Swiss-Prot record:
The gene is ENCR. It comes from Trypanosoma brucei brucei (strain 927/4 GUTat10.1). Belongs to the steroid 5-alpha reductase family. Its EC number is 1.3.1.-. This is Putative enoyl-CoA reductase. GO terms for biological process: very long-chain fatty acid biosynthetic process. It is found in: Membrane. It holds the Pfam family Steroid_dh.
Length: 298
């Protein structure tokens, strides 16, 4: 079949087999351009060409004919710009905080001056270790647990994500490793918060393993509604346990920078959770009976 590809003010006719998929179209049109940069849309049946919302993005999991593309159809091409792999973004953004904290902890004299450096107190040692363990866990999950439905994201996202994580890591690391750091007055609070953080990290890991098991592998875009005790109150317990872990860290260290990171994470994860919760409701209306991220609240 012949399909006309519209790109701005120009157009080009490409020939495809009748059972072609989106990948076939991407390979034929502008073959020198990376296929991950290419996006194609088709006008919904009866839609207005001047209405952007009337266009449907073609899905790589379905044949083009199943999505309304036939001989003589027109599709609209968009260059998504330079792309970078999802896994690469995660590895880089999580490696930064780990490297920053280790640099602070290993060479405090370079940061604070050799004349005022003193031995770390118990709380500092404990929470430096927990901070590093958290991001080591994230790196291991990125390599061995997470399965990404999309292969790439815009390259600019790696800068945005790194600025977020690395900036907070600079603030948290500077305060936690500082010779002027004052640990909480209650050793019980310090230890109880550390235990709580470990528990929440393990629960977060358990959720990630369950979610990973629901997908066949990278590129699998199916989103079945997760079930089980961890999902009994909220749709996204991984975000809940992530936030609770940082609440525990903040309580145990009593640092404003940590509370700032926790609050920023809460805002962002709440947005993601609400979006996922709404998608789950479309699949299973009974999901309305629970909240998105915070039990009984949100």
């Amino acid at each position: 079949m012949k399909v006309t590809v519209i790109s701005g003010s120009s157009s080009e006719v490409v020939e495809l087999p009748s059972n072609a998929g989106l990948t076939d179209l991407k390979k034929v049109y502008k073959p020198r351009v990376d296929i991950h940069r290419k996006s194609f849309k088709i006008l919904r049946s009866g839609g207005d060409k001047n209405d952007k919302s009337a266009y449907i993005t073609l899905d790589a999991k379905r044949a083009l004919t199943e999505q309304g593309v036939k001989d003589g159809s027109e599709v609209v091409y968009k260059d998504l710009g330079p792309q970078v792999g999802y896994r690469t973004v995660f590895v880089v953004e999580y490696a930064g905080p780990l490297a920053i904290m280790l640099a602070y902890a290993a060479r405090p004299s370079f940061i604070y001056g050799s004349s005022i450096v003193k031995e770390y107190c118990y709380t500092q040692k404990l929470y430096i270790a927990l901070f590093c363990a958290h991001f080591i866990k994230r790196e291991l999950e990125t390599f061995f647990v997470h399965k990404f439905s999309h292969p790439t994201m815009p390259r600019r996202n790696i800068i945005k994500n790194c600025v977020y994580y690395w900036t907070f890591a600079l603030g948290i690391g500077y305060a936690l490793c500082s010779p002027y750091y004052t640990e909480p007055a209650s050793p019980t609070l310090v230890n109880a918060s550390a235990v709580a953080m470990v528990i929440f990290e393990l629960l977060n890991f358990a959720v990630h393993v369950q979610l990973s098991g629901m997908r066949k592998g990278d590129g699998d875009a199916t989103r079945p509604v997760p079930k089980g005790i961890l999902f009994s109150l909220v749709s996204c317990p991984n975000y809940l346990f992530e936030i609770l872990s940082w609440v525990a860290f903040s309580l145990g260290t009593s640092m404003l920078t940590s509370w700032g990171f926790t609050f920023a994470g809460l805002v962002q994860m709440a947005e993601w959770a609400v979006k996922k919760h709404k998608n789950y409701i479309k699949t299973d209306p009974s999901v309305r009976n629970k909240k998105a991220m915070l039990p009984f609240l949100l």
